[in-house]
Protein backbone atom coordinates (compact mmCIF):
# COMPACT_ATOMS: atom_id res chain seq x y z
CA UNK A 1 0.00 0.00 0.00
CA UNK A 2 1.39 3.40 -1.01
CA UNK A 3 1.25 5.62 2.10
CA UNK A 4 3.15 8.58 0.70
CA UNK A 5 0.04 10.80 0.66
CA UNK A 6 -0.03 10.61 4.45
CA UNK A 7 3.56 9.97 5.59
CA UNK A 8 5.53 12.10 3.13
CA UNK A 9 5.66 15.92 3.03
CA UNK A 10 8.44 16.88 0.68
CA UNK A 11 7.28 20.50 0.82
CA UNK A 12 8.48 20.77 4.41
CA UNK A 13 11.74 22.65 4.89
CA UNK A 14 14.36 21.40 7.32
CA UNK A 15 15.05 24.90 8.63
CA UNK A 16 11.34 25.35 9.41
CA UNK A 17 11.18 22.00 11.20
CA UNK A 18 14.16 22.96 13.35
CA UNK A 19 12.74 26.42 14.06
CA UNK A 20 9.42 24.84 15.04
CA UNK A 21 11.19 22.88 17.75
CA UNK A 22 8.83 19.90 17.97
CA UNK A 23 10.50 17.28 15.78
CA UNK A 24 13.42 14.91 16.15
CA UNK A 25 15.05 14.68 12.72
CA UNK A 26 16.79 11.55 11.49
CA UNK A 27 18.93 11.03 8.40
CA UNK A 28 19.24 7.53 6.96
CA UNK A 29 20.94 5.81 4.07
CA UNK A 30 18.12 3.61 2.74
CA UNK A 31 17.71 1.42 -0.32
CA UNK A 32 14.38 -0.19 -1.26
CA UNK A 33 14.26 -3.74 -2.51
CA UNK A 34 13.89 -4.27 -6.24
CA UNK A 35 10.43 -3.41 -7.50
CA UNK A 36 9.64 -0.82 -4.80
CA UNK A 37 9.66 2.94 -5.32
CA UNK A 38 11.87 5.12 -3.15
CA UNK A 39 9.21 7.50 -1.84
CA UNK A 40 6.72 4.67 -1.35
CA UNK A 41 9.24 2.71 0.73
CA UNK A 42 10.33 5.78 2.69
CA UNK A 43 6.71 6.56 3.58
CA UNK A 44 6.14 2.97 4.70
CA UNK A 45 9.31 3.28 6.82
CA UNK A 46 7.96 6.45 8.48
CA UNK A 47 4.56 4.84 9.04
CA UNK A 48 6.07 1.75 10.66
CA UNK A 49 8.24 4.05 12.81
CA UNK A 50 5.29 5.98 14.18
CA UNK A 51 1.50 5.75 13.84
CA UNK A 52 0.97 3.41 10.91
CA UNK A 53 1.09 -0.16 9.76
CA UNK A 54 0.72 -1.84 6.38
CA UNK A 55 -3.03 -1.07 6.16
CA UNK A 56 -5.34 1.74 7.23
CA UNK A 57 -7.02 1.05 10.57
CA UNK A 58 -10.41 2.28 11.74
CA UNK A 59 -9.13 3.57 15.09
CA UNK A 60 -7.04 6.36 13.51
CA UNK A 61 -8.34 9.87 14.29
CA UNK A 62 -7.25 13.43 13.58
CA UNK A 63 -4.98 13.57 16.64
CA UNK A 64 -3.22 10.41 15.53
CA UNK A 65 -2.55 11.92 12.12
CA UNK A 66 -1.11 14.98 13.85
CA UNK A 67 1.75 12.93 15.28
CA UNK A 68 2.66 11.02 12.12
CA UNK A 69 6.36 10.73 11.35
CA UNK A 70 6.93 12.44 8.02
CA UNK A 71 9.44 11.91 5.26
CA UNK A 72 10.53 15.46 4.43
CA UNK A 73 13.51 14.92 2.12
CA UNK A 74 14.76 12.18 -0.18
CA UNK A 75 17.65 11.80 -2.59
CA UNK A 76 17.21 8.41 -4.26
CA UNK A 77 20.52 8.63 -6.14
CA UNK A 78 22.48 9.11 -2.91
CA UNK A 79 20.03 6.85 -1.01
CA UNK A 80 19.40 9.63 1.53
CA UNK A 81 16.11 9.69 3.42
CA UNK A 82 15.22 12.17 6.18
CA UNK A 83 12.30 11.73 8.55
CA UNK A 84 10.78 14.12 11.11
CA UNK A 85 9.41 12.50 14.28
CA UNK A 86 7.09 14.60 16.49
CA UNK A 87 8.45 14.66 20.04
CA UNK A 88 5.05 13.54 21.35
CA UNK A 89 5.73 10.07 19.96
CA UNK A 90 8.51 9.31 22.42
CA UNK A 91 7.83 7.56 25.72
CA UNK A 92 8.58 9.30 29.02
CA UNK A 93 9.09 8.08 32.56
CA UNK A 94 6.06 7.99 34.84
CA UNK A 95 8.28 8.75 37.86
CA UNK A 96 9.79 12.02 36.65
CA UNK A 97 8.72 12.72 33.07
CA UNK A 98 12.25 12.26 31.75
CA UNK A 99 13.05 10.94 28.29
CA UNK A 100 14.28 7.40 27.72
CA UNK A 101 16.67 6.43 24.97
CA UNK A 102 15.10 3.01 24.53
CA UNK A 103 11.96 4.72 23.21
CA UNK A 104 14.00 6.74 20.73
CA UNK A 105 15.62 3.53 19.48
CA UNK A 106 12.36 1.60 19.38
CA UNK A 107 10.83 4.12 16.99
CA UNK A 108 13.75 5.28 14.87
CA UNK A 109 15.65 2.01 14.54
CA UNK A 110 13.09 -0.61 15.57
CA UNK A 111 10.65 -2.56 13.39
CA UNK A 112 11.72 -0.60 10.34
CA UNK A 113 14.96 -2.62 10.33
CA UNK A 114 13.05 -5.75 9.32
CA UNK A 115 10.65 -4.41 6.71
CA UNK A 116 10.18 -6.56 3.64
CA UNK A 117 10.45 -3.70 1.15
CA UNK A 118 13.74 -2.34 2.55
CA UNK A 119 17.04 -3.70 1.25
CA UNK A 120 18.91 -1.80 3.97
CA UNK A 121 18.55 1.28 6.13
CA UNK A 122 21.11 2.81 8.45
CA UNK A 123 20.81 5.93 10.58
CA UNK A 124 23.72 8.31 10.01
CA UNK A 125 22.63 11.15 12.25
CA UNK A 126 19.81 12.65 14.25
CA UNK A 127 18.91 16.10 15.55
CA UNK A 128 17.32 16.69 18.97
CA UNK A 129 15.21 19.85 19.52
CA UNK A 130 15.65 21.79 22.78
CA UNK A 131 12.36 20.66 24.34
CA UNK A 132 13.36 17.00 23.99
CA UNK A 133 17.07 17.39 24.71
CA UNK A 134 16.32 18.94 28.10
CA UNK A 135 14.50 15.73 29.12
CA UNK A 136 17.70 13.65 28.98
CA UNK A 137 20.05 13.30 31.95
CA UNK A 138 23.32 14.15 30.22
CA UNK A 139 26.65 13.60 32.00
CA UNK A 140 27.11 14.44 35.66
CA UNK A 141 30.91 14.05 35.49
CA UNK A 142 33.54 14.24 32.78
CA UNK A 143 37.28 14.66 32.21
CA UNK A 144 37.30 17.98 34.08
CA UNK A 145 36.45 16.05 37.25
CA UNK A 146 39.33 13.65 36.57
CA UNK A 147 41.68 16.58 36.07
CA UNK A 148 40.55 17.98 39.40
CA UNK A 149 41.37 14.71 41.18
CA UNK A 150 44.74 14.62 39.41
CA UNK A 151 45.49 18.17 40.57
CA UNK A 152 45.47 19.65 37.07
CA UNK A 153 43.70 22.70 35.63
CA UNK A 154 40.07 21.86 34.89
CA UNK A 155 40.33 23.46 31.45
CA UNK A 156 42.79 22.00 28.93
CA UNK A 157 44.19 19.64 31.53
CA UNK A 158 45.61 17.37 28.84
CA UNK A 159 45.76 13.66 28.17
CA UNK A 160 44.97 11.24 30.96
CA UNK A 161 47.57 8.49 30.56
CA UNK A 162 45.78 5.17 30.84
CA UNK A 163 45.95 1.47 30.19
CA UNK A 164 43.91 -1.69 30.07
CA UNK A 165 45.36 -4.52 32.09
CA UNK A 166 46.31 -7.34 29.73
CA UNK A 167 45.75 -10.18 29.21
CA UNK A 168 42.08 -9.28 29.28
CA UNK A 169 41.26 -12.57 31.03
CA UNK A 170 43.33 -15.12 32.88
CA UNK A 171 45.05 -13.05 35.57
CA UNK A 172 44.49 -13.98 39.20
CA UNK A 173 43.80 -11.14 41.67
CA UNK A 174 47.39 -10.58 42.84
CA UNK A 175 49.04 -10.51 39.39
CA UNK A 176 46.27 -8.18 38.26
CA UNK A 177 46.86 -5.78 41.16
CA UNK A 178 50.63 -6.01 40.69
CA UNK A 179 50.20 -4.94 37.06
CA UNK A 180 48.07 -1.99 38.22
CA UNK A 181 50.77 -0.90 40.65
CA UNK A 182 53.46 -1.17 37.97
CA UNK A 183 51.55 1.03 35.53
CA UNK A 184 50.48 3.57 38.14
CA UNK A 185 54.13 4.33 38.93
CA UNK A 186 54.23 6.06 35.54
CA UNK A 187 50.61 6.60 34.49
CA UNK A 188 47.27 7.98 35.71
CA UNK A 189 44.38 5.72 34.84
CA UNK A 190 43.62 2.00 34.64
CA UNK A 191 40.44 0.41 33.35
CA UNK A 192 39.06 -3.05 33.62
CA UNK A 193 38.90 -4.65 30.21
CA UNK A 194 35.26 -5.17 29.28
CA UNK A 195 34.98 -8.90 30.17
CA UNK A 196 36.74 -8.57 33.53
CA UNK A 197 34.32 -8.90 36.40
CA UNK A 198 33.71 -11.70 38.89
CA UNK A 199 35.25 -14.76 37.24
CA UNK A 200 35.81 -17.81 39.44
CA UNK A 201 39.59 -17.46 39.10
CA UNK A 202 39.46 -13.75 39.96
CA UNK A 203 36.63 -13.00 42.42
CA UNK A 204 35.66 -9.34 42.21
CA UNK A 205 35.81 -8.69 45.93
CA UNK A 206 39.30 -10.11 46.30
CA UNK A 207 40.57 -8.32 43.19
CA UNK A 208 39.11 -4.96 44.19
CA UNK A 209 40.65 -5.15 47.68
CA UNK A 210 44.08 -5.70 46.17
CA UNK A 211 43.64 -3.00 43.52
CA UNK A 212 42.57 -0.46 46.15
CA UNK A 213 45.71 -1.29 48.12
CA UNK A 214 47.85 -1.00 44.97
CA UNK A 215 46.40 2.46 44.33
CA UNK A 216 47.29 3.61 47.84
CA UNK A 217 50.84 2.31 47.51
CA UNK A 218 51.31 3.89 44.08
CA UNK A 219 50.00 7.23 45.34
CA UNK A 220 52.34 7.08 48.33
CA UNK A 221 55.28 6.18 46.08
CA UNK A 222 54.68 8.89 43.46
CA UNK A 223 52.89 11.59 45.44
CA UNK A 224 50.30 11.69 42.64
CA UNK A 225 46.62 10.78 42.50
CA UNK A 226 45.67 7.65 40.54
CA UNK A 227 42.40 6.58 38.88
CA UNK A 228 40.67 3.23 38.34
CA UNK A 229 37.66 2.37 36.16
CA UNK A 230 35.90 -0.65 37.63
CA UNK A 231 33.51 -2.78 35.60
CA UNK A 232 30.04 -2.96 37.17
CA UNK A 233 28.30 -4.35 34.07
CA UNK A 234 25.57 -6.88 34.82
CA UNK A 235 22.19 -8.03 33.52
CA UNK A 236 20.56 -7.16 36.82
CA UNK A 237 20.09 -3.61 38.15
CA UNK A 238 20.60 -4.78 41.73
CA UNK A 239 23.83 -6.58 40.84
CA UNK A 240 25.21 -3.41 39.26
CA UNK A 241 24.35 -1.39 42.34
CA UNK A 242 25.80 -4.04 44.66
CA UNK A 243 29.08 -4.05 42.74
CA UNK A 244 29.26 -0.28 42.72
CA UNK A 245 28.57 0.08 46.43
CA UNK A 246 31.13 -2.58 47.34
CA UNK A 247 33.79 -0.94 45.17
CA UNK A 248 33.21 2.53 46.66
CA UNK A 249 33.27 1.14 50.19
CA UNK A 250 36.50 -0.72 49.51
CA UNK A 251 38.31 2.26 47.98
CA UNK A 252 37.17 4.36 50.95
CA UNK A 253 38.92 7.73 50.99
CA UNK A 254 39.85 7.19 47.34
CA UNK A 255 36.24 6.64 46.21
CA UNK A 256 36.35 9.79 44.08
CA UNK A 257 39.29 8.24 42.20
CA UNK A 258 36.97 5.49 40.92
CA UNK A 259 35.03 5.46 37.65
CA UNK A 260 32.39 2.88 36.79
CA UNK A 261 32.67 1.06 33.48
CA UNK A 262 29.50 -0.22 31.84
CA UNK A 263 29.35 -2.19 28.60
CA UNK A 264 26.66 0.11 27.25
CA UNK A 265 26.07 -1.44 23.85
CA UNK A 266 25.56 -5.03 24.99
CA UNK A 267 23.56 -4.12 28.12
CA UNK A 268 21.61 -1.26 26.56
CA UNK A 269 20.30 2.10 27.77
CA UNK A 270 18.86 0.67 31.01
CA UNK A 271 22.33 -0.18 32.33
CA UNK A 272 23.76 3.22 31.45
CA UNK A 273 20.83 4.99 33.11
CA UNK A 274 21.15 2.77 36.19
CA UNK A 275 24.79 3.75 36.62
CA UNK A 276 24.14 7.42 35.82
CA UNK A 277 21.32 7.74 38.34
CA UNK A 278 22.56 5.46 41.11
CA UNK A 279 26.12 6.83 41.10
CA UNK A 280 25.98 10.46 39.89
CA UNK A 281 29.26 11.31 41.63
CA UNK A 282 31.26 8.74 39.67
CA UNK A 283 32.69 9.10 36.18
CA UNK A 284 30.49 6.89 33.94
CA UNK A 285 32.74 5.03 31.51
CA UNK A 286 30.74 3.82 28.49
CA UNK A 287 32.46 0.85 26.86
CA UNK A 288 30.98 0.04 23.46
CA UNK A 289 32.09 -3.60 23.00
CA UNK A 290 29.99 -5.25 20.29
CA UNK A 291 28.94 -2.03 18.58
CA UNK A 292 30.70 -2.95 15.34
CA UNK A 293 27.95 -5.47 14.61
CA UNK A 294 25.76 -2.53 13.58
CA UNK A 295 28.04 0.53 13.38
CA UNK A 296 30.73 -0.87 11.08
CA UNK A 297 30.81 0.69 7.60
CA UNK A 298 30.49 -2.89 6.37
CA UNK A 299 27.05 -3.12 8.00
CA UNK A 300 24.30 -1.49 5.97
CA UNK A 301 21.73 -1.64 8.76
CA UNK A 302 21.49 -0.16 12.24
CA UNK A 303 23.29 3.10 12.96
CA UNK A 304 26.79 4.54 12.81
CA UNK A 305 29.41 4.95 15.53
CA UNK A 306 28.71 8.69 15.31
CA UNK A 307 25.07 8.07 16.24
CA UNK A 308 26.11 5.79 19.12
CA UNK A 309 28.42 8.47 20.48
CA UNK A 310 25.80 11.19 20.22
CA UNK A 311 23.28 8.99 22.05
CA UNK A 312 25.83 8.36 24.81
CA UNK A 313 26.00 12.06 25.65
CA UNK A 314 22.22 12.24 25.94
CA UNK A 315 22.21 9.22 28.25
CA UNK A 316 24.81 10.71 30.57
CA UNK A 317 28.04 8.92 29.71
CA UNK A 318 31.04 10.76 31.16
CA UNK A 319 33.25 9.20 28.51
CA UNK A 320 32.88 6.77 25.62
CA UNK A 321 35.37 4.91 23.48
CA UNK A 322 35.61 6.58 20.08
CA UNK A 323 38.23 4.41 18.39
CA UNK A 324 41.53 5.70 17.11
CA UNK A 325 40.44 7.53 13.95
CA UNK A 326 42.63 5.34 11.77
CA UNK A 327 45.77 5.74 13.88
CA UNK A 328 45.46 2.47 15.81
CA UNK A 329 44.30 -1.06 15.08
CA UNK A 330 40.56 -0.47 15.10
CA UNK A 331 38.30 0.32 12.15
CA UNK A 332 38.01 4.04 11.49
CA UNK A 333 39.54 7.00 9.68
CA UNK A 334 40.66 10.57 10.27
CA UNK A 335 37.21 12.01 9.56
CA UNK A 336 35.94 10.34 12.73
CA UNK A 337 37.16 13.40 14.62
CA UNK A 338 33.70 14.93 14.14
CA UNK A 339 32.54 12.26 16.57
CA UNK A 340 34.82 13.72 19.24
CA UNK A 341 33.70 17.27 18.50
CA UNK A 342 30.03 16.29 18.84
CA UNK A 343 30.84 14.80 22.25
CA UNK A 344 32.87 17.70 23.61
CA UNK A 345 31.64 20.93 22.04
CA UNK A 346 28.79 23.15 23.18
CA UNK A 347 27.53 23.12 19.59
CA UNK A 348 28.81 21.00 16.72
CA UNK A 349 28.16 20.18 13.08
CA UNK A 350 27.55 16.55 12.23
CA UNK A 351 27.26 14.88 8.84
CA UNK A 352 23.73 16.28 8.37
CA UNK A 353 22.70 18.44 11.33
CA UNK A 354 24.01 21.19 13.60
CA UNK A 355 23.38 20.32 17.25
CA UNK A 356 23.29 22.82 20.11
CA UNK A 357 23.75 21.05 23.45
CA UNK A 358 22.25 23.89 25.55
CA UNK A 359 24.85 23.65 28.30
CA UNK A 360 24.73 19.87 28.66
CA UNK A 361 28.06 18.64 30.01
CA UNK A 362 30.55 17.25 27.52
CA UNK A 363 31.31 13.56 27.13
CA UNK A 364 35.01 12.70 27.02
CA UNK A 365 36.49 10.78 24.07
CA UNK A 366 38.32 7.66 25.26
CA UNK A 367 41.00 6.55 22.83
CA UNK A 368 42.04 2.91 22.68
CA UNK A 369 42.90 0.13 20.28
CA UNK A 370 46.48 -0.39 19.12
CA UNK A 371 47.87 2.98 20.22
CA UNK A 372 51.40 3.51 21.50
CA UNK A 373 53.75 6.44 22.06
CA UNK A 374 54.77 6.54 18.40
CA UNK A 375 51.24 6.81 17.05
CA UNK A 376 49.98 9.51 19.41
CA UNK A 377 51.42 12.61 17.67
CA UNK A 378 49.64 11.85 14.40
CA UNK A 379 46.41 11.25 16.28
CA UNK A 380 46.70 14.59 18.10
CA UNK A 381 47.58 16.39 14.86
CA UNK A 382 44.32 15.14 13.39
CA UNK A 383 42.17 15.85 16.45
CA UNK A 384 43.77 19.21 17.23
CA UNK A 385 44.11 18.76 20.99
CA UNK A 386 45.10 16.19 23.63
CA UNK A 387 42.19 16.50 26.07
CA UNK A 388 41.30 12.82 25.96
CA UNK A 389 41.59 9.69 28.05
CA UNK A 390 44.06 7.46 26.25
CA UNK A 391 44.24 3.78 27.18
CA UNK A 392 47.03 1.65 25.74
CA UNK A 393 47.23 -2.01 26.70
CA UNK A 394 49.96 -3.34 24.45
CA UNK A 395 51.29 0.21 24.04
CA UNK A 396 52.15 0.22 27.74
CA UNK A 397 52.89 -3.39 28.68
CA UNK A 398 54.46 -4.11 25.28
CA UNK A 399 57.26 -1.68 26.14
CA UNK A 400 60.58 -3.49 26.44
CA UNK A 401 61.14 -2.09 29.93
CA UNK A 402 57.68 -2.87 31.30
CA UNK A 403 54.49 -1.08 32.22
CA UNK A 404 55.99 1.80 34.18
CA UNK A 405 58.30 2.73 31.32
CA UNK A 406 55.45 2.24 28.86
CA UNK A 407 53.30 4.69 30.80
CA UNK A 408 56.11 7.24 30.91
CA UNK A 409 56.71 6.90 27.17
CA UNK A 410 53.06 7.73 26.49
CA UNK A 411 53.23 10.84 28.65
CA UNK A 412 56.51 11.89 27.04
CA UNK A 413 54.99 11.50 23.59
CA UNK A 414 52.13 13.81 24.53
CA UNK A 415 54.54 16.31 26.10
CA UNK A 416 56.59 16.35 22.90
CA UNK A 417 53.50 17.00 20.81
CA UNK A 418 52.31 19.82 23.06
CA UNK A 419 55.77 21.39 22.92
CA UNK A 420 55.87 21.11 19.14
CA UNK A 421 59.05 19.03 19.25
CA UNK A 422 59.75 16.22 16.79
CA UNK A 423 59.32 12.87 18.54
CA UNK A 424 62.74 11.52 17.57
CA UNK A 425 64.42 14.69 18.83
CA UNK A 426 62.48 14.50 22.10
CA UNK A 427 63.40 10.83 22.50
CA UNK A 428 67.11 11.69 22.57
CA UNK A 429 66.67 13.12 26.07
CA UNK A 430 63.87 10.84 27.30
CA UNK A 431 64.90 7.23 27.69
CA UNK A 432 61.43 5.68 28.01
CA UNK A 433 60.33 7.31 24.77
CA UNK A 434 63.54 6.26 23.04
CA UNK A 435 62.97 2.68 24.13
CA UNK A 436 59.43 2.87 22.72
CA UNK A 437 61.02 3.14 19.28
CA UNK A 438 62.84 -0.13 19.95
CA UNK A 439 59.71 -1.67 21.47
CA UNK A 440 57.57 -0.99 18.40
CA UNK A 441 60.09 -1.07 15.53
CA UNK A 442 57.54 -1.69 12.77
CA UNK A 443 55.67 1.48 13.68
CA UNK A 444 58.96 3.33 14.12
CA UNK A 445 60.21 2.35 10.66
CA UNK A 446 56.93 3.36 9.05
CA UNK A 447 56.34 6.63 10.88
CA UNK A 448 59.87 7.85 11.59
CA UNK A 449 62.33 6.80 8.87
CA UNK A 450 65.90 7.33 10.01
CA UNK A 451 65.14 6.91 13.70
CA UNK A 452 67.75 4.18 14.14
CA UNK A 453 70.60 6.46 13.11
CA UNK A 454 69.25 9.40 15.10
CA UNK A 455 68.90 7.33 18.27
CA UNK A 456 72.02 5.22 17.76
CA UNK A 457 70.15 1.93 17.44
CA UNK A 458 71.59 -0.82 15.25
UniProtKB/Swiss-Prot annotation:
Question: Which CDD domains does the UniProt record give?
Answer: RuBisCO_large_II
Question: Native species of this protein?
Answer: Rhodobacter capsulatus (strain ATCC BAA-309 / NBRC 16581 / SB1003)
Q: How is the cofactor bound?
A: Binds 1 Mg(2+) ion per subunit.
Please tell me where substrate binds in this chain. Answer: 111, 168, 288, 321, 368
- What name does the UniProt record give this protein? Ribulose bisphosphate carboxylase
Any idea which UniProt keywords this protein has? Calvin cycle, Carbon dioxide fixation, Lyase, Magnesium, Metal-binding, Monooxygenase, Oxidoreductase, Photosynthesis
Q: Enumerate the InterPro entries for this protein.
A: RuBisCO (IPR033966), RuBisCo_large_chain_AS (IPR020878), RuBisCO_lsu_C (IPR000685), RuBisCO_lsu_C_sf (IPR036376), RuBisCO_lsu_fd_N (IPR017443), RuBisCO_lsu_N_sf (IPR036422), RuBisCO_lsuII (IPR020871)
Q: Which cofactor does it need?
A: Mg(2+)
What gene is behind this protein?
Answer: cbbM
The free-text function statement in the UniProt record for this protein reads: RuBisCO catalyzes two reactions: the carboxylation of D-ribulose 1,5-bisphosphate, the primary event in carbon dioxide fixation, as well as the oxidative fragmentation of the pentose substrate. Both reactions occur simultaneously and in competition at the same active site.
Q: Which residues carry this modification: N6-carboxylysine?
A: 191
Has the keyword ATP-binding been applied to this entry?
A: no
Q: Example GO biological process term? A: reductive pentose-phosphate cycle
- Residues holding Mg(2+): 191, 193-194
**What residues sit in the active site?**
166 (proton acceptor), 287 (proton acceptor)
Q: Which PROSITE patterns match?
A: RUBISCO_LARGE (PS00157)
Amino acid sequence: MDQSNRYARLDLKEADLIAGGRHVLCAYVMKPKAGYGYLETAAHFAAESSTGTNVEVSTTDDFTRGVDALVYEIDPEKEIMKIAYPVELFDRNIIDGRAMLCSFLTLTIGNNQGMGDVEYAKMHEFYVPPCYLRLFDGPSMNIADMWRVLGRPVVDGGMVVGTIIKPKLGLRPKPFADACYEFWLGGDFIKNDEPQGNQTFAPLKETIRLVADAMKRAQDETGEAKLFSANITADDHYEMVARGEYILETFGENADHVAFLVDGYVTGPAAITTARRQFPRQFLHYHRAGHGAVTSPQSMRGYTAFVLSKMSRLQGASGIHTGTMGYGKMEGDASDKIMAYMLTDEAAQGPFYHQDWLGMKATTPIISGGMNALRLPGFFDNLGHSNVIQTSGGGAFGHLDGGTAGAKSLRQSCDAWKAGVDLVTYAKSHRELARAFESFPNDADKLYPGWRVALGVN
